[in-house]
Swiss-Prot record:
The modification Phosphothreonine is found at T387. The modification Phosphoserine is found at S19, S163, S385. The gene is FLOT1. The keyword Phosphoprotein applies. This is Flotillin-1. PANTHER family: FLOTILLIN-1-RELATED, FLOTILLIN-RELATED. One of its GO terms (molecular function) is protease binding.
Length: 427
């Protein structure tokens, strides 16, 4: 049959085939009924309130001490567990705690007897360490380990600790008064010194402040110069950058315009090509057809005109021949007339010349006075003497006509007056 236990207890199996007994702390074990026996022992931690009443210390002063200890049976160490089983197997936790408490109290009393009240009161850590050390070495033989020990309380019935406190309090108060007086004295000295140091520090501080102000103003002036220089450089750089940016923008704009212009040119070229094709489809081909038609019409008209011209030329030729025949007949008649005039001239000579001159004289007079007939307006300017108005014009015309014989004589060499006064001669 299997038996189990928790980590806070141990099982001890003894009997048939179990020599020495088997000890299991926190686990399971197989037990043969009737021929084997199983017992349990607690491994719980036990809290002990260790009181030592009216124990005389090294100087014979009785005091009472209370300590708190934590102890337990050690289950991890087989030897300590075996010792605990030999001593406490079958006992309850209360019985085990009582045994451990009696042991600890004895060791606590022993340590108190070897120490003074002042040592126990002032150095509790030392007292606790000594009790823990002595009790642990004794309880380990029982299989019990001391987990911790602390001194909880110290008191006495003789007011020793209170008197010790009074003396200490009086000493402390005395030291406090002395310290207070010395402190006041030192405080006055320190106050005066502090005032002196304060004034000196104030002067030094003002000097340092003046130096700092001077250094600040110098550094600030240098900083302002540097800042203004950097700001001017930054402004100039900004303006340069703005100018460069504007230039780049302008270049980009020009490039865009060039591209747009190129695109427009390409579009225009495409439009021109399209219009040329459209023109060729709408105008050129019909024009070529019209031209061919006109050429054909012109050729037909040309042939017609040639035929008309040939007919007119034939008509003109025949008319010319007729006119030539008429002119020839007229010329023959005029020649006969001229021959007769020549015969008459030969017969009458000067009389014939005079007759010819007189016959042509009106024509000559007409040609001489021709410019006057084309004048639309005549303006007469008088010098204040002589005739005026139409009489003046008539006189001028008569004067021109009176000079006609002279003109004829200069042109022909024949004097009308001489011919007129000579007697007519015949051949």
């Amino acid at each position: 049959m299997f038996f189990t236990c928790g980590p806070n207890e141990a099982m001890v199996v003894s009997g048939f085939c179990r020599s020495p007994p088997v000890m299991v702390a926190g686990g399971r074990v197989f037990v043969l009924p009737c021929i084997q026996q199983i017992q349990r022992i607690s491994l719980n931690t036990l809290t002990l309130n260790v009181k030592s009443e009216k124990v005389y210390t090294r100087h014979g002063v009785p005091i009472s001490v209370t300590g708190i200890a934590q102890v337990k049976i050690q289950g991890q160490n087989k030897e300590m567990l075996a010792a605990a089983c030999q001593m406490f197997l079958g006992k309850t936790e209360a019985e085990i705690a009582h045994i451990a408490l009696e042991t600890l109290e004895g060791h606590q009393r022993a340590i108190m007897a070897h120490m003074t009240v002042e040592e126990i009161y002032k150095d509790r850590q030392k007292f606790s360490e000594q009790v823990f050390k002595v009790a642990s070495s004794d309880l380990v033989n029982m299989g019990i380990s001391v987990v911790s020990y602390t001194l909880k309380d110290i008191h006495d019935d003789q007011d020793y600790l209170h008197s010790l406190g009074k003396a200490r309090t009086a000493q402390v108060q005395k030291d406090a008064r002395i310290g207070e007086a010395e402190a006041k004295r030192d405080a006055g000295i320190r106050e005066a010194k502090a005032k002196q140091e304060k004034v000196s520090a104030q002067y030094l501080s003002e000097i340092e402040m003046a130096k700092a102000q001077r250094d600040y103003e110098l550094k600030k002036a240098a900083y302002d110069i540097e800042v203004n220089t950097r700001r001017a450089q930054a402004d100039l750089a900004y303006q340069l950058q703005v100018a460069k940016t504007k230039q780049q923008i302008e270049e980009q704009r020009v490039q865009v315009q060039v591209v747009e212009r190129a695109q427009q040119v390409a579009v225009q070229e495409q439009e021109i090509a399209r219009r040329e094709k459209e023109l060729e489809a709408r105008v050129r081909k019909p024009a070529e057809a019209e031209r061919y038609k006109l050429e054909r019409l012109a050729a037909a008209e040309k042939s017609q005109l040639i035929m008309q011209a040939e007919a007119e030329a034939e008509s003109v030729r025949m008319r010319g021949e007729a006119e030539a025949f008429a002119i020839g007949a007229r010329a023959r008649a005029e020649a006969e007339q001229m021959a007769k005039k020549a015969e008459a001239f030969q017969l009458y000579q000067e009389a014939a010349q005079l007759d010819m001159l007189l016959e042509k004289l009106p024509q000559v007079a007409e040609e001489i006075s021709g410019p006057l007939t084309s004048a639309k307006k005549i303006t007469l300017v008088s010098s204040g003497s002589g005739t005026m108005g139409a009489a003046k014009v008539t006189g001028e015309v008569l004067d021109i006509l009176s000079r006609l014989p002279e003109s004829v004589e200069r042109l022909t060499g024949v004097s009308i007056s001489q011919v007129n006064h000579k007697p007519l001669r015949t051949a």
